[in-house]
């Protein structure tokens, strides 16, 4: 955190990445009619850059204009710095000129959050200002610069039109509400193409061919809209209305949805069309994920609080510690209260130090779960915990579940990635009162749901649980019975417990809840500091159809660390006694056509880890083993629905690995391997262990689909680097190198 935030105070050149060579895009005749879902492989695609979009050719004799970029004035040079010249509006001005609008660029070093907010006289944020911000961010290579640009826009909104901050934030991460509410757009591309045709007079085949060429319906929509002449220009869009209309669209269906999409698209100008269409598709494609947005929001808040001391958009060094503290407080608050409708009004009204008090955790709003670090053996556990008091719990092979009850007695069930699974488990809700002991009005418990054999009274494999219906579950038709194993209590009767140690939380859990055979059980646990007892308990857990053990501290460093993969929880699985300490959860980003017996399906796949710092997917291996014929058929049918015409701009890979088809990052697989090694081809964790090489898996083998994880919850680059460095052969080499360095230094 310290490193990434303080980097904002370095020179601009330090915060940006070097440009990559342009991507070659195959030319396609715009008048050639393509099938509804064609898959065209891009030529010599470079994974590091976004495609350069050429001006569209037009049906008949109509001419089109290329997409307008944000206009930039010639640079002015003085003795100290070179900077963009940005038109500023005087503090007493009453109206923005056309030049003010066209030159709006929150990435400029001379940008002033108040003076350059050209909408300040109307107090309503134009959607075009947000769209231009997105456009600049999309064209920016450096992540820190992207965050700084967004922070400038947020600061302007805070100062000029604070009521627009909530919709601006949601639109920046392409959400319409907190994630746990499940309100999503996801309008089909075919529907949007028809709306674009209706609004612009374009031919549907032409729109399809251009979308195939660019891989981006948003770009096609913008170019179609820019080239269109209109007798009467609709009133300009503003952020508040666009957000409200998008929420309406999400709740509508049929022709009424189509009509509203059409009416909104007709009102779009310039880059508004691009990002409006992308929002409807559900892929904004600007590279801003939630953690980056929270950082931008924190920096924007500090700029706003010290606007009189800021020279343009630059924050004086004296406030850099405040930025670090504000970012940490904001991210911590969001972990326990993931709702911008609550957080943003609080940061605008109260001091940031009051944020956690103003945004408390409460039932019905999921927390980001605490996660465990993998270990390779019992000895490593005792090396980590030393003389601390520890407890070992069986690690159940099921689905993580955070179960909430509010004061009204309403039950909510959330997955590890905050997805609302309440409708999936009506049977658990029906029997939830039997769990209670004593006066319990509200609670949040952390648990694991497993498939349960009622007759044999034993746990069934995860694969059985995965066959259970996810939606529209009728309690009378449930075939897979479940049992809940509870291992933590986070909230009870209005009191948050996350700052208490595990011993206290467990005591309260046993006081207020009780087991019900085959329905509700406490995790089987053993408190011990004896290494032989831990080894024996591990073997017992495996016989009990579990994955292994979770080892936790009881008193020291034993608070519940929300949203953190903590070294105070260690997982010890039966597979850990091999060279690699853990399986990996990887994202499928590409597929290779099968040959021989596998003809007609994909025979192999390209997998990637997720780099949370750079918000990109980095290739880590090609995989073709561990699949049954049925697996390959299932994967091919599912992934075939998510093929894209080119690699995403946030995929990092070597061109030699290019698959036959690229996929959207929609599915996570659990994978085992023999070991990890440095690779000149794969890009996983590149720059962490080695400056020029990434890390790859040797002999990867498919284990299962992880439906409980989304792509951004996949194994991240830092975890991959840690797993590589934890291997015995790597540690031995490091020791040898260190010894040689010491000897060289001595002599």
UniProtKB/Swiss-Prot annotation:
As recorded in UniProt, its EC number(s) are: 6.5.1.1
**Signal sequence segment:** none
Positions with biased composition (Polar residues): 725-740
Record field: catalytic activity: ATP + (deoxyribonucleotide)n-3'-hydroxyl + 5'-phospho-(deoxyribonucleotide)m = (deoxyribonucleotide)n+m + AMP + diphosphate
The cysteines covalently paired via disulfide bonds are: none
Q: Which parts of the sequence carry Phosphoserine?
A: 18, 20, 42, 44, 46, 60, 65
Give the location in the cell. Answer: Nucleus
**Region Disordered: start-end pairs:** 1-84, 725-747
> Per the UniProt entry, what are the Gene Ontology biological process annotations, in alphabetical order?
cell division; DNA biosynthetic process; DNA recombination; DNA repair; lagging strand elongation; Okazaki fragment processing involved in mitotic DNA replication
* InterPro entries listed in its UniProt record: ATP-dep_DNA_ligase, DNA_ligase_ATP-dep, DNA_ligase_ATP-dep_C, DNA_ligase_ATP-dep_cent, DNA_ligase_ATP-dep_CS, DNA_ligase_ATP-dep_N, DNA_ligase_N_sf, NA-bd_OB-fold
- Biased composition regions of type Basic and acidic residues, renumbered to the chain: 26-42, 60-84
Question: Which terms in the Gene Ontology molecular function aspect does this entry carry?
Answer: ATP binding; DNA binding; DNA ligase (ATP) activity
Q: Which GO terms describe its cellular component?
A: cytoplasm; nucleus
Show the Gene3D superfamilies listed in the entry. 3.30.1490.70, DNA ligase, ATP-dependent, N-terminal domain, DNA ligase/mRNA capping enzyme, Nucleic acid-binding proteins
Instruction: State the function annotated in the UniProt record.
Output: DNA ligase that seals nicks in double-stranded DNA during DNA replication, DNA recombination and DNA repair.
Family listed:
Belongs to the ATP-dependent DNA ligase family.
- Put simply, this protein is called DNA ligase 1
Q: Which organism is it from?
A: Drosophila melanogaster (Fruit fly)
Classification from the root reads: Eukaryota, Metazoa, Ecdysozoa, Arthropoda, Hexapoda
């Amino acid at each position: 955190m310290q490193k990434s935030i303080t980097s904002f105070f370095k020179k601009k050149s330090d915060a940006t990445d070097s440009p990559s060579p342009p991507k070659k895009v195959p030319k396609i005749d715009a008048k050639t009619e393509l099938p509804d879902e064609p898959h065209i492989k891009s030529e010599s695609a470079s994974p590091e850059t976004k495609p350069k979009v050429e001006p569209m050719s037009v049906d008949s004799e109509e001419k089109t204009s290329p997409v307008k970029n944000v206009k930039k004035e010639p640079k002015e040079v003085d003795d100290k710095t070179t900077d963009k010249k940005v038109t500023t509006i005087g503090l007493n001005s009453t109206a923005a000129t056309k030049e003010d609008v066209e030159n709006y660029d929150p990435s400029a070093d001379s940008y002033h959050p108040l003076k350059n907010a050209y909408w300040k006289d109307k107090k309503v944020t134009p959607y075009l200002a947000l769209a231009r911000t997105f456009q600049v961010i999309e064209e920016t290579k450096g992540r820190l610069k992207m965050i700084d640009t967004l922070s400038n826009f947020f600061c302007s909104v805070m100062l000029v039109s604070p009521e627009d901050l909530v919709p601006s934030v949601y639109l920046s991460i392409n959400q319409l509400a907190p994630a746990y509410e499940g309100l999503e757009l996801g309008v089909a591309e075919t529907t949007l193409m028809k709306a674009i045709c209706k609004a612009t007079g374009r031919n549907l085949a032409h729109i399809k061919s251009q979308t195939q060429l660019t891989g981006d319906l948003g770009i096609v929509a913008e170019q179609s809209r820019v080239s269109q002449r209109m007798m009467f220009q609709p009133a300009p869009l503003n952020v508040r209305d666009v957000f409200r209309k998008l929420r309406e669209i999400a709740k509508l269906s049929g022709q009424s949805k189509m009509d509203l999409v059409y009416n909104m698209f007709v009102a779009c100008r310039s880059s508004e069309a691009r990002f409006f269409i992308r929002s409807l598709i559900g892929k904004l494609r600007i590279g801003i994920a939630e953690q980056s947005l929270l950082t931008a929001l924190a920096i924007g808040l500090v700029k706003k609080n010290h606007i009189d001391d800021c020279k343009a958009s630059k924050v004086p060094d004296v406030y850099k510690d405040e930025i670090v503290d504000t970012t940490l407080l904001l991210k911590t608050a969001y972990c326990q209260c993931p709702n911008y409708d609550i957080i943003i009004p609080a940061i605008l009204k109260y001091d940031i130090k009051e944020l956690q008090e103003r945004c408390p955790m409460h039932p019905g709003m999921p927390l980001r779960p605490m996660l465990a670090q993998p270990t390779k053996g019992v000895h490593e556990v005792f090396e980590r915990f030393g003389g601390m008091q520890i407890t070992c719990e069986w690690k159940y092979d099921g689905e993580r579940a955070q179960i909430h009850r509010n004061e009204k007695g309403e039950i909510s069930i959330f997955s590890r990635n905050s997805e609302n699974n309440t409708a999936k488990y009506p049977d658990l809700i029906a029997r939830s009162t039997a769990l209670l002991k004593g006066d319990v009005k509200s609670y949040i418990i952390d648990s694991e749901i497993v498939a349960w054999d009622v007759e044999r009274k034993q746990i069934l494999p995860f694969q059985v649980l995965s066959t259970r219906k996810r939606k529209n579950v009728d309690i009378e038709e449930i075939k897979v019975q479940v049992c809940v194993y509870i291992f933590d209590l986070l909230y009870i009767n209005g009191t948050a417990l996350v700052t208490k140690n595990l011993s206290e939380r467990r005591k309260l859990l046993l006081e207020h809840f009780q087991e019900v055979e085959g329905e509700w059980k406490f995790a089987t646990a053993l408190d011990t500091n004896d290494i032989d007892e831990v080894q024996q308990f591990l073997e017992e857990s495996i016989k009990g159809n579990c994955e292994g053990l979770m080892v936790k501290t009881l008193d020291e460093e034993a608070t519940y660390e929300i949203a953190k993969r903590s070294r105070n929880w260690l997982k010890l699985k039966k597979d850990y006694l091999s060279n690699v300490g853990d399986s990996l959860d990887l994202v499928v980003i590409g597929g290779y056509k099968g040959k021989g017996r596998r003809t007609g399906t994909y025979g192999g796949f390209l997998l990637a880890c997720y780099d949370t710092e750079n918000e990109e997917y980095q290739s880590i291996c090609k995989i073709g083993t561990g699949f049954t014929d049925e697996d390959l058929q299932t994967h091919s049918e599912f992934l075939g629905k998510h093929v894209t015409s080119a690699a995403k701009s946030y995929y990092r890979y070597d061109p030699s690995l290019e698959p036959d088809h690229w996929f959207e990052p929609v599915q996570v697989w659990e994978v085992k391997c023999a070991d990890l090694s440095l690779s000149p081809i794969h890009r996983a964790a590149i720059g962490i262990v080695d400056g020029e090489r990434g890390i790859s898996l040797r002999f990867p083998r498919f284990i299962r689909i992880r439906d409980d994880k989304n792509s951004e919850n996949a194994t991240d680059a830092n975890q991959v680097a840690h797993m590589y460095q934890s291997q015995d052969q790597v540690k031995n080499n490091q020791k040898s190198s260190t010894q040689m360095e010491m000897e060289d230094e001595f002599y």
